[in-house]
Every structure is written in C-alpha cells, then in structure tokens.
C-alpha cells in the first residue's frame, strides 16, 4: 500500500485523532498539580492552599528534640550527691560543748587530768579554759584564785588574760601521794643544812588533817618553798638557802620560848589528832573580824593564800625548832620577813578556804606537828 492511497490516509487521520483525544484527557485542569515553588514556602497567590506539599522534617529538628531529654537526667544526680555531704558536718561541730542557760559548758574528765600539773607562777588563759580548770591544774582553790586576780562571779575569763597562780617555786601544790613522795625526796636533800625555816617547812607537806567542814584533808598542806620567796627554784638554790638563812634567824636561834599565848579567844571545836588523817592542830571558833595574835615572838616566813584549803595563811618562825601556823584568816595584817612580838595582832578571823568562821592553829617542832594544847596555858 502506497503512502498516497486513500486507505493509508484514513488510517493516519484516525491514529492522529486517537492520539489527540488521549492527550486531551491527560490535560484536564480540574486538579492542577502543586507547584514546585511551594516546597520553599513561596506558592503563587492563585494556588490552592490545600494542595501544598509539606517538606519532611530536617535532621537538625530531630537533634534538637533529643537534647532536652539529656539535661533533666543530669540535674537530679548532682543534687543527690550534695545533700548527704552537708548533713553530717553540723552535729560534729557541736559535740565538744553543751549549752546551759545560754552559757557554754565544757565536758572535761577531771579524773584524767593531773591535779597541780602546772608549775608556773602565772598562767595565760587559752580558748576553752575555765577558772575551775586553771585552779585544778595549778593546785589552787578556784575561789582563792578568783580573789587573788579580782575576778567576780560568774568568773568569766578572756583569751590571753594572765592570771597569778602563785606557784613561783616551780613545785605543783596539790594533794595526794604523788606530791608527798616528791616532797619527801626533796626533804632528804634539804634536811642536812642548818635547821632553819626551809628545813622545817619543807617537811610539812607530808602531814595532812581533816576537819568537820568536809574539806579534803589531802590538800591541807603547809607551803614548802614560800619562806625563800626571793629564790625561784628552791631545790636548785639549796646552798644559797643554807648560807643566808642562819644570818637572818641568828637573832632567834638560841632564844627559848618561855610562854605561849592563845592566838585568839573562842571555843576549841576541833582537837589535835596524832593518827594519820587526824587534825594536826586545833580549830577555834569565833566571829568574823575577831583578832588573831602571834602566839610568841618570831618572824613571818609566809603570808599568802596560794595553798588550797588553807585560805589566807600566816606562818611564823619562832626559832630553829618551832613554827606556828594560822589559817582561814579574813585579813592578814603582816607581811613576809616581818618581825612580830608575842600578842601582836597579825590577822582577823575569817572563813577563807573553809565553810565556817574559825582559826586553824598549828605548832610544829622540828617540822613535826605537836599538840598545841600542851604548850598553850590552861584557861
């Protein structure tokens, strides 16, 4: 069949018609395709908004959604580790002290603290110190220590404050067996020089007594170094004491005591006891301010209140053999190294170092306590 025949022409026209109809059907504009420009959010004004194609979420959006999930997990872990570390710190700082009536109370076990362990003549207050603690380690009565340093109740102290504790000799002044053994050893060194006040007084700490007031008798000891007040350490200066004392006491060395006088008026309420732990003198009751006189001529070798339990104490050396002691005085009217006469007023009666107004009176012969009633005239 040739290209110009009528049949070929008809078939060609029919084929073109079918192709035209098919193309016309595919070009229907009732559902226009979404413009490509809507992907970037720039659709034309006449474009149907319902046919916009929403782009898929970006990778950056997904990563930002995961980060908030990590942050809340880390925060609770930090808080949980901080709280247990703060709680146990607070009660530990409060354990050493207690508060009572707005004041700090220190809990000390005094049974484990050596009494009289401090040997200096002054003491500097440190943090945590109390007057009772200082009195304990220096071998003093806290009331006497307060009086000596003009400290009023309730006995408040300041850090750095210097207190006069009276242990200038370097020997702790306490009761108990430890100090007795130390004094006995010291006595063995001093006893061989001339019989002077140093020898007589040094032997006295080994002798104790008790009284009805309930004071501890172990602390009632006469001083062992006060007569040599110019010497700081008596054991070291034994040669000095043996050379100087005979010169001072030579005026009374050979003077016998013909008559003893009663040191005060009043009733004897405690008598002499020779047994161990007994009263090594006599106690005479009286009224505060009552006169105390020297029982015989002599020289004052000690006047002070450094010894716990004695209060204001005066010791008079009458000769190389005899001493007399007057304790619990209210006011002392003589000073150390002062010469006194028999019957001279040396003090007024009081209650320092004890619970009632009284005079504790002792006579010692060559450092040994004797019954004063054997020497005093009967009345």
Swiss-Prot record:
Domain of life, source organism: Bacteria
GO molecular function term, any single one: metalloendopeptidase activity
Sequence repeats: 66-73, 74-81, 82-89, 90-97, 205-211, 227-233, 239-245, 246-252
Annotated region (4 X 7 AA approximate repeats), positions in chain: 205-252
LysM domain boundaries: 121-165
Residues covered by region (4 X 8 AA tandem repeats of Q-Q-P-Q-I-Q-P-V): 66-97
Lipid attachment, kind S-diacylglycerol cysteine: 26
PROSITE patterns: LYSM (PS51782), PROKAR_LIPOPROTEIN (PS51257)
Keyword Cell inner membrane: yes
Lipidation (N-palmitoyl cysteine): 26
Keyword tags: Cell cycle, Cell division, Cell inner membrane, Cell membrane, Lipoprotein, Membrane, Palmitate, Repeat, Signal
Protein localization: Cell inner membrane
One GO cellular component term noted in the UniProt record for this chain: plasma membrane
Signal peptide, first to last residue: 1-25
InterPro entries: Cell_wall_metabolism_enzyme (IPR050570), Dup_hybrid_motif (IPR011055), LysM_dom (IPR018392), LysM_dom_sf (IPR036779), Peptidase_M23 (IPR016047)
Free-text disruption phenotype from the record: Cells are shorter in a single mutant, double envC-nlpD disruptions have defects in septation and cell separation and form long filaments (8-fold longer). Cell length increase is more exacerbated with a triple mepM (yebA) or ygeR disruption (15-fold longer) and further yet by the quadruple disruption mutant (envC-nlpD-mepM(yebA)-ygeR, over 21-fold longer). Quadruple mutants are less sensitive to ampicillin lysis.
Its membrane topology: Lipid-anchor
Keyword Lipoprotein: yes
Region described as Disordered: spans on this chain: 30-67, 210-231, 240-259
Family: Belongs to the E.coli NlpD/Haemophilus LppB family.
Role summary: Activator of the cell wall hydrolase AmiC. Required for septal murein cleavage and daughter cell separation during cell division.
NCBIfam families (UniProt xref): PRK10871.1
Name assigned to this protein: Murein hydrolase activator NlpD
Organism of derivation: Escherichia coli (strain K12)
Name of the gene this protein is made from: nlpD
């Amino acid at each position: 069949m040739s290209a110009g025949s009528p049949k070929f022409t008809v078939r060609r026209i029919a084929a073109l018609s079918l192709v035209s109809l098919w193309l016309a059907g595919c070009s229907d504009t009732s559902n226009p395709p979404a413009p490509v420009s809507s992907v970037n959010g720039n659709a034309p004004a006449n474009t149907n908004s319902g046919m916009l194609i929403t782009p898929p979420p970006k990778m950056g959006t997904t990563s930002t959604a995961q980060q908030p999930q990590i942050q809340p997990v880390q925060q609770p872990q930090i808080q949980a580790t901080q709280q247990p570390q703060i709680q146990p710190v607070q009660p530990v700082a409060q354990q050493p002290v207690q508060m009572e009536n707005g004041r700090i109370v220190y809990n000390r076990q005094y049974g484990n603290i050596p009494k009289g362990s401090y040997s200096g003549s002054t003491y500097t207050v440190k943090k945590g110190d109390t007057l009772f603690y200082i009195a304990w380690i220096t071998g003093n009565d806290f009331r006497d220590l307060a009086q000596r340093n003009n400290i009023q109740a309730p006995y408040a102290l300041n850090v750095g404050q210097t207190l006069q504790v009276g242990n200038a000799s370097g020997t702790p002044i306490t009761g108990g067996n430890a100090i007795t053994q130390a004094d006995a050893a010291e006595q063995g060194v001093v006893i061989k020089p001339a019989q002077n006040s140093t020898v007589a007084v040094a032997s006295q700490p080994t002798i104790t007594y008790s009284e009805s007031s309930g004071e501890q008798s172990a602390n009632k000891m006469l001083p062992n170094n006060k007569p040599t007040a110019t010497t700081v350490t008596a054991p070291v200066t034994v040669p000095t004491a043996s050379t100087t004392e005979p010169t001072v006491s030579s005026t009374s060395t050979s003077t016998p005591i013909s008559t003893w006088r009663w040191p005060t008026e009043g009733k004897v309420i405690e008598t002499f006891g020779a047994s161990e732990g007994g009263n090594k003198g006599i106690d005479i009751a009286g009224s505060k301010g009552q006169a105390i006189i020297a029982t015989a001529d002599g020289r004052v070798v000690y006047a002070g209140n450094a010894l716990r339990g004695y209060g204001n104490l005066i010791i008079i050396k009458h000769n190389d053999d005899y001493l007399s002691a007057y304790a619990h005085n209210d006011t002392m009217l003589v000073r150390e190294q002062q010469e006194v006469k028999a019957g001279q007023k040396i003090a007024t009666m009081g209650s320092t170092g004890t619970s009632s107004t009284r005079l504790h009176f002792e006579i010692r012969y060559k450092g040994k306590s004797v019954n004063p009633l054997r020497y005093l005239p009967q009345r």
